[in-house]
Swiss-Prot record:
Gene giving rise to this polypeptide: cobT
Organism annotation: Pseudomonas savastanoi pv. phaseolicola (strain 1448A / Race 6) (Pseudomonas syringae pv. phaseolicola (strain 1448A / Race 6))
Function according to Swiss-Prot or TrEMBL: Catalyzes the synthesis of alpha-ribazole-5'-phosphate from nicotinate mononucleotide (NAMN) and 5,6-dimethylbenzimidazole (DMB).
Keywords for this protein: Cobalamin biosynthesis, Glycosyltransferase, Transferase
Catalysed reactions listed for this entry: 5,6-dimethylbenzimidazole + nicotinate beta-D-ribonucleotide = alpha-ribazole 5'-phosphate + nicotinate + H(+)
Active site: E316 (proton acceptor)
Pfam families recorded: DBI_PRT
Protein name per its UniProtKB record: Nicotinate-nucleotide--dimethylbenzimidazole phosphoribosyltransferase
Assigned protein family: Belongs to the CobT family.
């Protein structure tokens, strides 16, 4: 494809700054390694941000929304109109991510990529690509043109975030049926059996999970030619919001903004991004390990060390948002603690 912007290499890690941050960590008034993952996080951020003392104060949360044709197969516990209703809830301040964004002083960017029924909501950026995706149980979920538009929508949100000095980017999603789409994409990319990744989503019972698994298996057989191909798996089996998340993660790496990845659906988008452009992996932090059974497998595949494990399964970017205070505190500890010399505290003998 022409103008394959997503193949542009990610920005390089600033190794001298990472080493300077590590040296500082080793001089802070605590036993070496005693703050464990928080120490590693601060040092990692220093290398990514190119400064010895990193920060995560300026936060951007983008919520990408779109409907899914595969809902016609009866794979969701909720009706399709909930997608549009939740867009109202996001901008009216009543959703979980809305509350979290307020508490974290984050910019909330709500993007409608294609609900079934067109919406006219103040506070939502309407970038409609279609009236939801097509039913991937019978054909491709989207055309290449639609898929590229969705990737670009994610990139555009990151460019907006960069323009206001964002230090940490969170992508969230809303779309009834999107755990089905995400599971199908991941199975195709990883060429693995559906039962390994398929779970209850928003609350299916055992019978519902079995039906959802069968639908995905039929779709994987239909689109078998795309197996192992991340871009075409995304376009044939994914959703507009999953493609936008993929584009956002790729753009974050290219523009030098750290991305904090949410749960299962966002991790599938991260998987596609990394398979398309492995250099973007360094720029992805992972907020939590969710309750969806396949999430653990994805995190292991991505060699990710999530910050939280609370059994969450909401989506919306909520798990990543809940991890932001930990990221900020890791920075504050790194930046604000005294060294042994400054505090006149004896260090451990060499």
């Amino acid at each position: 494809m022409s103008n394959s912007w997503w193949l542009k290499p990610a920005q390089a890690i600033d190794v001298p700054m990472r080493e300077a941050a590590l040296a500082r960590q080793q001089q802070l008034t605590k036993p070496a390694g005693s703050l464990a993952q928080l120490e590693r996080l601060a040092v990692q951020l220093a290398g990514l941000q190119g400064r010895e003392r990193p920060a995560a104060d300026k936060l951007w949360i983008a919520i990408f929304a779109g409907d899914h044709g595969v809902v016609a197969e009866g794979v969701s516990a909720y009706p399709q109109e909930v997608t549009g209703q939740m867009l109202h809830n996001f901008v009216n301040g009543g959703a979980a991510i809305s509350v979290l964004a307020r508490q974290l002083s984050a910019q909330l960017d709500v993007v409608d990529l294609g609900t079934v029924a067109p919406l006219d909501l103040p506070g939502v950026r309407h970038l409609r690509i279609g009236a939801g995706t097509a039913n991937f149980a019978h054909g491709p979920a989207m055309s290449a043109e639609q898929g590229l538009a969705a990737l670009q929508a994610g990139r555009d949100s990151v460019l907006r975030a960069k323009a206001v000095g964002t230090e940490l980017f969170i992508g969230g999603e809303m779309g009834i049926g999107n755990t089905t789409a995400a599971s199908a994409v991941a199975c195709s990319v990883l060429e693995c059996a559906a039962p390994l990744l398929v779970g209850p989503g928003t609350g299916l019972n055992a019978e519902g999970i079995e039906h959802k698994t069968r639908v995905i298996e039929r779709a994987l057989a239909l689109h078998a030619e795309q197996a192992g191909d991340p871009l075409h798996s995304l376009f044939c089996l994914g959703g507009f919001e999953i493609a936008a998340l993929t584009g956002a993660y790729l753009a974050c790496a290219q523009e030098g903004i750290v991305a904090l990845v949410d749960g299962f659906i966002c991790s599938v988008a991260a998987l596609v991004a990394v398979r398309l452009n492995p250099s973007c992996r360094n720029w992805l932090l992972f907020g939590h390990r969710g309750a969806e059974p396949g999430h653990r497998h994805l995190l292991e595949t991505l060699q990710a060390e999530p910050l939280l494990d609370l059994g969450l399964r909401l989506g919306e970017g909520s798990g990543a948002a809940l991890a932001v205070p930990l990221v900020r505190l890791a920075c504050e500890l790194h930046n604000g603690m005294a060294t042994f010399a400054e505090a006149a505290v004896a260090d451990r003998p060499a």
